[in-house]
């Protein structure tokens, strides 16, 4: 049986269909999960995709973090289920306290839509096992509130414990230490602002580098 990877849809989610397609291209079974679901439908991993869930009211990701499906995701993550938060999904994971820090307005207060090179810093996670440390991958980024910030002690902890997963090579949004993605203490929960699901086909993306995250998750599930 192929791995089952769920992708959550919230009101205002934009990239759920792309994430479902990426899961399918990688060879797993995509499962659509609705924000009001309490049952994760037997999935082996979850993707929290990008968009503007609930219109970004209050704070980006703040309302979505309280949705019924996220309570189930929090419990599943506690049991070791791989979870990937992309863009707004990363914001949701920080609001749900599955990952530390916060994503704030970009430096210069501009919305950026760019293809960006990321340095792979940590390959010891559920979502980066097929990548190589130091490898550069090319994926799209599109956000207005993607500047990663945290207290100095938290930044120190992330760096010292090797929990920075991706780093911008150009740091266009002003994130502290160029941090583009991080993981939790187990390496099973990963969040990043750029969009790997938009880099899985040569016809539609700048590369196919993003496919490796989904292939890594499939390998993790099979292990």
From Swiss-Prot:
Q: Which part of the chain is the Glutamine amidotransferase type-1 domain?
A: 4-223
Q: Name one GO biological process term.
A: 'de novo' IMP biosynthetic process
Q: In which pathway does it act?
A: Purine metabolism; IMP biosynthesis via de novo pathway; 5-amino-1-(5-phospho-D-ribosyl)imidazole from N(2)-formyl-N(1)-(5-phospho-D-ribosyl)glycinamide: step 1/2
Which cellular compartments is it found in? Cytoplasm
Keywords tagged on the record: ATP-binding, Cytoplasm, Glutamine amidotransferase, Hydrolase, Ligase, Nucleotide-binding, Purine biosynthesis
Write down the CDD domains for this protein, in alphabetical order.
GATase1_FGAR_AT
The entry lists its GO molecular-function terms as: ATP binding; glutaminase activity; phosphoribosylformylglycinamidine synthase activity
* Metal-binding is among the record's keywords: no
What InterPro entries has UniProt attached to this entry?
Answer: Class_I_gatase-like, PRibForGlyAmidine_synth_PurQ
Q: Which GO terms describe its cellular component?
A: cytoplasm
Q: Which reaction does it catalyse?
A: N(2)-formyl-N(1)-(5-phospho-beta-D-ribosyl)glycinamide + L-glutamine + ATP + H2O = 2-formamido-N(1)-(5-O-phospho-beta-D-ribosyl)acetamidine + L-glutamate + ADP + phosphate + H(+); L-glutamine + H2O = L-glutamate + NH4(+)
Pfam family for this entry, one: GATase_5
Q: Where is the active site?
A: 87, 195, 197
The UniProt subunit note reads as follows: Part of the FGAM synthase complex composed of 1 PurL, 1 PurQ and 2 PurS subunits.
Q: Quote the function comment for this protein.
A: Part of the phosphoribosylformylglycinamidine synthase complex involved in the purines biosynthetic pathway. Catalyzes the ATP-dependent conversion of formylglycinamide ribonucleotide (FGAR) and glutamine to yield formylglycinamidine ribonucleotide (FGAM) and glutamate. The FGAM synthase complex is composed of three subunits. PurQ produces an ammonia molecule by converting glutamine to glutamate. PurL transfers the ammonia molecule to FGAR to form FGAM in an ATP-dependent manner.
Q: By what name is this protein known?
A: Phosphoribosylformylglycinamidine synthase subunit PurQ
Q: Which gene encodes it?
A: purQ
């Amino acid at each position: 049986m192929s791995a089952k990877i769920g992708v959550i849809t919230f009101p205002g989610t934009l990239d759920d269909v792309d994430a479902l397609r990426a899961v399918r291209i990688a060879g797993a079974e995509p499962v659509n999960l609705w924000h009001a679901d309490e049952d994760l439908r037997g999935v082996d991993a979850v993707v929290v995709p990008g968009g503007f869930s609930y219109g970004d009211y209050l704070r980006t990701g703040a309302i979505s973090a309280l949705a019924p499906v996220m309570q189930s995701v929090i419990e599943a993550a506690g049991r070791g289920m791989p979870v990937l938060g992309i863009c707004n999904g990363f914001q949701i994971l920080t609001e749900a306290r599955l990952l530390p820090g916060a994503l704030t307005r970009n430096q210069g207060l501009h919305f950026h839509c760019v293809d960006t090179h990321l340095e792979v810093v940590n390959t010891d996670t559920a979502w980066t096992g097929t990548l190589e440390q130091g490898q550069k991958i090319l994926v799209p980024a599109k956000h207005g509130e993607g500047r990663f910030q945290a207290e100095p002690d938290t930044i120190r902890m992330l760096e010292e414990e090797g929990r920075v997963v991706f780093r911008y090579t150009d740091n266009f949004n002003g994130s502290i230490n160029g941090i583009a993605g991080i993981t939790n203490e187990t390496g099973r929960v990963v969040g990043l602002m750029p969009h790997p699901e938009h880099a899985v086909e040569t016809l539609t993306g700048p590369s196919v580098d993003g496919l490796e995250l989904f292939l890594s998750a499939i390998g993790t599930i099979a292990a």
